[in-house]
Amino acid sequence: MADRIYDYKREKTKRVVKKVGFVISILVILAIVFSIAFDLFLELIQIKEIGRNFVSVFWKNFYVKLSVQVVSFMILFFVFFVNNAVIKRNIERIVGKISLLKKNILNVIVSVLLALIASRYLENNLYIKFLTFKHSKPFNIKDPIFNKDVGYYVFERPFFLSIVNFLFYLVIFVCIYTVVLYIVLYGFAFVSRVNSWGVLYDKKVRSHIFFNLILIFVIKIFTLKYEMEGLLYSFFGEVVGVGYTDYYIRMNYFRLSYIVLVAVILLSIYFFIKGKYANIAKVMLSYIGWAVLGTIIATAFQYFVVSPNEQVYERSFLEKNIKFTRLAYNLENIEEKYFPVDTSGTITAEDLQKNTGTIENIRITDYPTTLAILNQIQRFKQYYIFNDADIAKYTINGKIKSVFISAREINYDGIPTKTYINQKFQYTHGYGVVMSLMTEVTPEGQPKFIIKDIPLKSLDGAPKVTQPRIYYGEKTDPYVIVNTKVDEIDYPEGDSNRLFRYDGKGGIRLTPLNRLIFSYVYKDFRLLVSTAINSNSKILINRSIIERAKKVAPFFDYDTDPYILIDGKGHLVWVLDGYTKTNYYPYSEPTEEGFNYIRNSVKVLIDAYNGTLKFYIVDKNDPIVNVYKSIYPDLFENGDIPRDIAEHIRYPEYIFKVQASVLKRYHMTNPNVFYNKEDLWDFGKHKTPDGSIDYIPPYYSVMKLPDSQKEEMILMVPFTPLKYNTMIAWLAAKSSQENYGKLVLYKFPKGSTVYSPLQVENMIDQDPQISKDLSLWNQGGSKVIRGNLLALPINQKILYIEPIYIASDNASALPEVKRVIAACNGKVVMGSSLNDALSQLVGQQVTPVKDQMQTPSQKENITQVLPSSDLLKIKSLFEDAKKALQQGNWEEFGKKFKELDDMMKNVK
């Protein structure tokens, strides 16, 4: 009787456990399905907020993802269900019925869960590859080994390779899963009274396991094709891509591997039928031995046959490597020119006169100091911040000028009282931009602002800003709620604030359902219960412009340095560069980031007030972007970028650095020179503001290139030979509308000695007077900050310019341009201004930059030259008198002032 009561309780407990397990499993499945559905709905309403024209992108992705997931789920469910059923049958044959496995519902639940997880992974990784495969386009370039169009490797091969690899690793997982499940169930049945591993000795269990192992080798046959094609990306020896050993040894190894694998599979099936599982294991291990043997043979062949005469063997393969790498990074279209540099003397006044536009645009303000000054004197309130200062070109009073333009964004760390109302309802946006000339400073040595202050003031011909509010920005990220019962703070005005209410296109209406959704998404219960929110309120989300673009088109890579412009209507518009990349371009050397092909094919314009996005194709020859256009026809705008924006865009620094980095080696097109690394280049170096030595970053400048008729904005970088400091070449990228993206490489003649930026920096340090002055200014509570050294081609000479900042030695000090250093062909001078430095360099007074637009008669009068010795003497006396006055040496001051007065009396 006692036993029966015990049995009843145990059976009841089992039923309860099974029911609870069943309910939990169903809840888990429902939770997964609900989570997927909720994520899709949330993504849809976010896409609608960004732009209804992008909804077609969402639905295209949704249908493809759904198709991939449904098909893969059905296949995976079948695989797991059948595998589990075989395991159940074998276990119950060995140990008898197991109550846990009595019904098939557990098998269904486990199979559904595993299939959901695996199909979800496959959907996320396969959908875009399927779309690009389906809409693939040719590059019209064939690889030299398999004679297939590059489009096959970029669009088709990745799709098939992903499927084959997924199946391969799936079967491996099933094998491991099967073994583990046998051991666990066997141990569960006997509750540790026997060795759980003993189940693996059962004939039918081993039959099941070895059947799965044979499947691995069957799928392996299909991977061989893609592994052989993968040699186009190999690094065996000195060649990127197929080399001599790859072509004659490893490719033949893969061809023979087909025969070996077929033999392994047939023998395994034969022994499987005979039940000789030990023989199957030996056959399978023999294939591993074959793989090891192939590696040994290839390595030995490379070492003993190829390496002793590698240059000869690899020559034709190096030619392929060079050709395809240059194609992949668009180096083939670089126009190479020789720059007949004149190193015989310094620059002349005539040289300057012939390059007036270039001289007028010589940059004497730098990014770090300009940004520091902006955050000191144009921030006004701690809840504003300048995150960046970007370079652009604008026509100011009829002349092209390079300017710094910086957005005054909202800074949530600086909000005075971090209440919910302040952070979400009142402090919602930044205000305006500041624009300063890169070529001029105030008498105090600070940037000359031509757009400044709050409210905005546009001076000296600068463009007017009619909508200064920045709701979407570079670092503007947290969500805010607008059109509530609380007015927004627009900008400070006296002792109070000007208020504002948003009337732009951005935002999602906060209906009761949307309030519930976003309170859950942001884990913010206050959003649900706040009485300040009404039926007109909208929530502004995805306000980071980069994340906003990624939300619509995640398949592009985006520049991390967007820049802001002022369009023809006075609205603020962000420009974000988008890149198409792949790591599947054959025979191309990859970058450190892993890709081996890049194009700047897309520019995204984002309205800073409305948050609207417009995608423009700027490289219509790029097959990758044309594939995306075929997939998503509604994503891109028809036509070109509007002229009022296009005239200000610039070639991106990111892709320029990538191309220049590759060019350091791949400018060598002769395979013998390339192999011997006879002419490796490096970027020029300079001294940073903290005194350390680093590579010169590419820099923008408005200048007239050699053989050009007018000034245009270019991005340039100098090259030096590797491990040597003389300058050997420089690369320029054009940003004008008619020449946008054209690259020109200027090479100096062999045998000419052109001082590099670092050598000029050393000359500055070694100049007795300059070194003395810099050391003196670096004392007594002040510090000297050396700006970026710029190398500028003027006629047939290289002119170097470096601004010198002086700042008080405290955190709140404003760096001010107090001196400008100029150098050319070994002569180094320092002046109180750019004109002064250039005057000393040429040995006579030069025309002030600001007077270049005067009439010819005025120009002639201005350029009448005083004797340079008198000018230098007057300047020297003035500096000595000023120094004596600062030191309180009245006797010396009187003496120098009298000498100066006497000289001035003789000046007509």
UniProtKB/Swiss-Prot annotation:
Protein name: UPF0182 protein Csac_0864
A Gene Ontology term for the protein's cellular component: extracellular region
InterPro entries: UPF0182
Compartments reported by the entry: Cell membrane
TM region(s), chain numbering: 22-42, 62-82, 98-118, 166-186, 208-228, 253-273, 286-306
Family: Belongs to the UPF0182 family.
Membrane topology: Multi-pass membrane protein
Keywords: Cell membrane, Membrane, Transmembrane, Transmembrane helix
Signal sequence residues: none
Pfam families xrefs: UPF0182
Domain of life: Bacteria
